[in-house]
Amino acid sequence: MSEQVTFQSHEDRIVGKHVFGNLYDIDPEDLNNEQLLKDLVLKAVEIAHMNLVEAKSWSFGGKKGGVSVIALIEESHIALHTWNEYNYATLDVYTCGEDSDPQAAFKFIVEALKPRRYQVFFADRSSS
């Protein structure tokens, strides 16, 4: 049996906020540290006033190995993927509802990983 969750604003619409980007030239030790990356994502969930459902992480070997961390939140998700060969990561923070702050989650992770440069993009994923 599954529960149905509906996010509505005062205007009776779904509010979707999507912040995503690319992080370049990150310390290789941080990029490969699965526990560090998972801890950062979990802390970002708290900072952004999100409600965690479950978090999973995976470490991948090989030439283009890295780490992936996915946090399923009631409001949607945070996904962090790293590629150690390129000192590169992608970060995706998507939330529904007005109470969460995906920009705060994105900013926290970027500040913790200290990339030499990064790109950030914003998308309004609201229903109207």
From Swiss-Prot:
Give the GO cellular component terms, alphabetically.
cytosol
Q: Which reaction does it catalyse?
A: L-arginine + H(+) = agmatine + CO2
Q: Name one GO molecular function term.
A: arginine decarboxylase activity
As cofactor, the record names: pyruvate
SUPFAM superfamilies xrefs: S-adenosylmethionine decarboxylase
PTM sites of type Pyruvic acid (Ser): S76
InterPro entries in alphabetical order = AdoMetDC_fam_prok, ArgDC, S-AdoMet_deCO2ase_core, S-AdoMet_deCOase_pro-enz
Q: What protein name is recorded for this chain?
A: Arginine decarboxylase proenzyme
Q: What class of enzyme is it?
A: lyase
Entry EC no(s): 4.1.1.19
Q: Which Pfam families does the record associate with it? A: AdoMet_dc (PF02675)
Q: Where is this site: Cleavage (non-hydrolytic)?
A: E75, S76
Member of which family? Belongs to the prokaryotic AdoMetDC family. Type 1 subfamily.
**Cofactor info, note text:** Binds 1 pyruvoyl group covalently per subunit.
